[in-house]
């Protein structure tokens, strides 16, 4: 049973027409789709809902980049409304597991599990663009079945809530009591408010400010 942060997170519809980049070399031309070309620069995109498919792709890309160079940072760009808790935790655990620092950057929005992954980046390397929006809240879910089964799943979602709030407290520096209160309902923040709260470290207005 998957518990979703996002009430109406749809299945990904794809990114539409993907531009191609042609590189010239001594051995001729080589064409890449734009995302594969950016992967060479250690840039990964989390765009749209967080689900098993997107999680598997992101985990695979992080593991590949670690094998390529375990001492060089990875850059995770996030524009997501949130989604599956289990899929998001697969990404989270991999971010903490691999050797390279994962720098996170919110472009557009990072809501619910998107916000959780944003704040899970390496300390000092978590960023927002000026007009980004960040939203945190408690996990959501529903289950139908026998009363005993509903009780089991209710206990599980309460366990996940406590677990996720504890991790948010760790990454933001807020107390568990503050996190419990502030995630009780949808809690939207501007980029500047996200810095004050500890979800990110800095608002970037130009690439030079990242220090990368």
Curated annotation (Swiss-Prot):
GO molecular function, one term: ATP-dependent peptidase activity
Reactions catalysed, as given in the entry: Hydrolysis of proteins to small peptides in the presence of ATP and magnesium. alpha-casein is the usual test substrate. In the absence of ATP, only oligopeptides shorter than five residues are hydrolyzed (such as succinyl-Leu-Tyr-|-NHMec, and Leu-Tyr-Leu-|-Tyr-Trp, in which cleavage of the -Tyr-|-Leu- and -Tyr-|-Trp bonds also occurs)
Gene Ontology biological process: protein quality control for misfolded or incompletely synthesized proteins
One cellular component term from this protein's GO annotations in UniProt: endopeptidase Clp complex
Localization, UniProt: Cytoplasm
Domain of life: Bacteria
The entry's keywords: Cytoplasm, Hydrolase, Protease, Serine protease
EC number assigned by the record: 3.4.21.92
Active site feature: 112, 137
Predominant location: cytoplasm
Family per similarity comment: Belongs to the peptidase S14 family.
HAMAP family per the UniProt record, alphabetical: ClpP
Functional note: Cleaves peptides in various proteins in a process that requires ATP hydrolysis. Has a chymotrypsin-like activity. Plays a major role in the degradation of misfolded proteins.
Subunit field text: Fourteen ClpP subunits assemble into 2 heptameric rings which stack back to back to give a disk-like structure with a central cavity, resembling the structure of eukaryotic proteasomes.
Protein name, UniProt field: ATP-dependent Clp protease proteolytic subunit
Species this chain originates from: Thiobacillus denitrificans (strain ATCC 25259 / T1)
Lineage: Bacteria, Pseudomonadati, Pseudomonadota, Betaproteobacteria, Nitrosomonadales
